Amino acid sequence: MPIEIPTDLTPELVPLSWLIGEWEGSGRLGAGEEDSEHFSQHVSFTHNGLPYLQYRAESWLTDDEGTRLRPLTVETGFWALERKQREEDGGPGLIPADIVPVLKSADEVEALRNSDGGFDISVSISHPGGISELYYGQIKGPQIQLSTDMVMRGSHSKEYTAATRIFGLVDGKLLWRWDVATGAGSTQGGGLEAHASAILSKIS
């Protein structure tokens, strides 16, 4: 599947452009074993001309034939190349960005390429229940690897200490896996465990 880059996309988002659009598909909770529960998911990556992608994923528990049983969760966030913020960048809050993008050309974006041949990225994701994650990682072509740098929990949130996520574009489909650590209650002394995985097809 050819990747179409929107004409109004800021150069800084070109490495992430293959994510843009809406995706739907299904997956399994846990390690995807025979008794693992099924879910369906709708994911969107959108842009508004600024140097980040807006992310939203809504999931539903399903039966093994894909019929929705009940809502599972929603998560939202922002994806961007990881770089030092400059005076021309917007924020914090409503402080406007300069009308001219900080990175104005492909050559300026290329200068951010790391020693592994990819680009460092940061991803922030918020969940119901007072939990927010800050991930750092790398995008290298159609592959993404993320690890939490910080997990923020509210005073009454469930235990949740770390996570990793991987994404890949394979034959036009978006594949992802999410591993989490939930503290001492997890097996193997609180280490990362398989949480969920899915295969999504692009619908727009």
UniProtKB/Swiss-Prot annotation:
Motif GXWXGXG in this chain: 21-27
Catalytic activity, as annotated: peroxynitrite = nitrate
Cystine crosslinks: none
EC number, UniProt record: 5.99.-.-
Enzyme class label: isomerase
Cofactor binding summary note: Binds 1 heme b group per subunit, that coordinates a highly solvent-exposed Fe(III) atom.
Binding-site residues, heme b: 195
Required cofactor names: heme b
GO molecular function, one term: metal ion binding
Keywords for the protein's UniProt record, in alphabetical order: Heme, Iron, Isomerase, Metal-binding
UniProt xrefs under PANTHER family: PEROXYNITRITE ISOMERASE THAP4, THAP4 PROTEIN
Subunit structure: Homodimer.
Function: Heme-binding protein able to scavenge peroxynitrite and to protect free L-tyrosine against peroxynitrite-mediated nitration, by acting as a peroxynitrite isomerase that converts peroxynitrite to nitrate. Therefore, this protein likely plays a role in peroxynitrite sensing and in the detoxification of reactive nitrogen and oxygen species (RNS and ROS, respectively). Is able to bind nitric oxide (NO) in vitro, but may act as a sensor of peroxynitrite levels in vivo.
Note on domains (UniProt): Forms a 10-stranded antiparallel beta-barrel structure able to accommodate a hydrophobic ligand in its interior. In fact, this fold hosts the heme group, which is located in a wide surface cleft.
Family the UniProt entry places it in: Belongs to the nitrobindin family.
Protein name: Peroxynitrite isomerase
